[in-house]
Amino acid sequence: THDTDAYRYFVGNGINKLFERALPETERTEANVLKIRSQFIPYYNIHNADLSRPYPGIEQVLHTLQANQILIGVASNKYQAATSKLIAQYFPDIQFVEVLGQREGVPAKPDPQAVLEIMEKVDVSREDVAYIGDSCVDMETGKNAGVTTIGASWGFRPRTELEAYTPDFIADEACDILRFLGIPEE
């Protein structure tokens, strides 16, 4: 077993990587990862929102972005079904242009493919995109996609980790995102 805080560093690169990191070194085989995954997914499909909720202020920020005709997409390393379910549950009033989770055959973040897919779908240029995330994986993803990066310091990883990846901006609270983008708060 691991200390709960250790899991903050196990997550972020998809569930297979989570299992690999959590397993003892001598047990880190593809067969073991797949076995755990087969047991985990049915459980997580039922319990993925347990002890989970949007960060303070995020719903208001999303509503403000939407009210200002800003297109919003999601690129996550959670598997696709879980990503879609969580977004629909927590943000039913937000019109996302695309919600992409981890999918078979598509590289996980920090590979930029999911971000680039969303950009292509809505035909926006890199200069018009801000990628927001709370980890080094997110900052790498945004940089790999060639877009503006905004680090959210209230997430799973410490502010110092975000700073090490030199995002264009670090938001210490949700409303800071609007200020950086030049959008007035409602």
Residue ranges and their predicted role:
Residues 28, 175-186:
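Generic C-terminal helix-cap and adjacent flexible tail
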Residues 68-71, 128, 148, 168:
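Structural signature of beta-strand start/N-cap positions in the alpha/beta core
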Residues 1-60, 66-71, 81:
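N-terminal helical cap/lid subdomain that shapes the substrate entry/recognition surface
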Residues 169-173:
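Short acidic-hydrophobic, aromatic-tinged amphipathic segments that line or gate anion-handling sites
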Residues 49-53, 79-132, 136-145, 159-163:
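Substrate-recognition "cap/lid" segment bordering the active-site pocket of phosphatases
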